[in-house]
Each structure stands twice: as structure tokens, then as C-alpha cells.
Amino acid sequence: MIKTYNGSKLGIASSHRKALLRNLAAALFLYEKITTTLSKAKELVSYSEKLVTKAKKADLSAMRAINGEINSKAAVKKIFDILVPRYKERSGGYTQILKVGTRRGDSADVAIVKLVT
């Protein structure tokens, strides 16, 4: 029986994929808007939504969990100081994907991922 997997493998090793998502999430939380390929954007949205939902608990275990996931101290500080109060009343849908077009060099679909204000 063929088993379906949750999420895309992105054609890279699991450790590389995990590092990629952590770095993209840190950049998204710091700058609130980043440009990447469409497949990476879709994976990033699912990953970052889970992090924000976990951070909304705002207890010590949530802080430690987020700190373990994201290596940037500035991004973690921004999550708890700015983003959690912003999304306090919102139950999901913190990010948005906007398709931009294709990249000239390799014709990859490009998208902008941004945090909803």
C-alpha cells in the first residue's frame, strides 16, 4: 500500500530541509516578508504557522520550544514581543503566499511569503 507523506521533501536531505525551514522562518519573522520558490513557500507557511500557534501559549515551555527551533535570538524576541500580541485574537492564518511569477535563470515559480498584519 502506498503511503502519502505530510509535506514535501523539497529534493534535499532531512537535515538540510530542517535547517532550511528554520532559517526561512527566522528571516520571515525578522523581516515579515521574504521571496522564495513556491514549493519552499508552501512548506514555510505550514512550519511558521505551527511556531506562531505554539508561541501564543506564552509560557516557559513554549519559549524554550521556540528557542530550540529558531536559532536567531532577535527573531525569537520579535515573536514574543510583537507577533504574539498582534495575533492574540486570530486563530490561524498568520501568513500569506503571493505568487510573483517565474525566476529568469531557471524558470522556478517564485512567491512572496508575508505575515498578515
Swiss-Prot record:
It comes from Endomicrobium trichonymphae. Belongs to the bacterial ribosomal protein bL17 family. Gene3D superfamilies: Ribosomal protein L17. One of its GO terms (biological process) is translation. One of its GO terms (cellular component) is cytosolic large ribosomal subunit. Keywords: Ribonucleoprotein, Ribosomal protein. One of its GO terms (molecular function) is structural constituent of ribosome. Part of the 50S ribosomal subunit. Contacts protein L32. PROSITE patterns: RIBOSOMAL_L17. InterPro entries: Ribosomal_bL17 (IPR000456), Ribosomal_bL17_CS (IPR047859), Ribosomal_bL17_sf (IPR036373). Coiled coil: none annotated. This is Large ribosomal subunit protein bL17.
